[in-house]
Amino acid sequence: DMGCEILWENGFLSVKSTDLKAVEFSGENCPDILPVLSLGLCFGKGRGKITNCQRLRIKECDRLTGTARLIKSLGGNINCDESSIYTSYTESLTRGDLTVYGDHRMRMLAAMCSTVAKGKISIDNTECVAKSYPNFWADFKSLGGKINGC
C-alpha cells in the first residue's frame, strides 16, 4: 500500500496522495506498465523495489535498463540489476532532452516524467506511441499534459 486514495466515480478513475510510501512488489505479471510504476515508486518515501522484471529486457528495447537510465538522467534515484528495479525518494525531476530507444512505452514514460519535472522535457519520435495507444497524446493533453509539436 503506497498510501494512495483510488476512486472510481462516474466512469473516471482518480488517484491522489499527499504522502506516497515506497513499497516492494513483483513485476512478473505487469511488464508493460513497469516503466511508469517505476517512476511513481521514485516519489514514495523510503526505498522501493520491483522484482521479477527480467521480461523487460526482451521488449522493443531493454526496458529495464532504459527505464532506470531515463529516470536517472532526469535526476531520479533509481537503479537496476539483472531482474529488479530499486528506487529511493526523489523530490523532483529536472529538464532534459531524451532519446528513448525507438520504443513506444519509453516515450509514454518520458511523457509521464514531464508531468513531475521542473522544466521542459523534449522527446524524440513521438509518433511511435500509436503502436499501442493511438490516442495517447490527445488523452495526455486532455488530462493537463503540455505538448508542443505533436
Where are the regions a protein language model picked out?
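Short, structured segments at the rim of ligand-binding sites
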Residues: 1-150
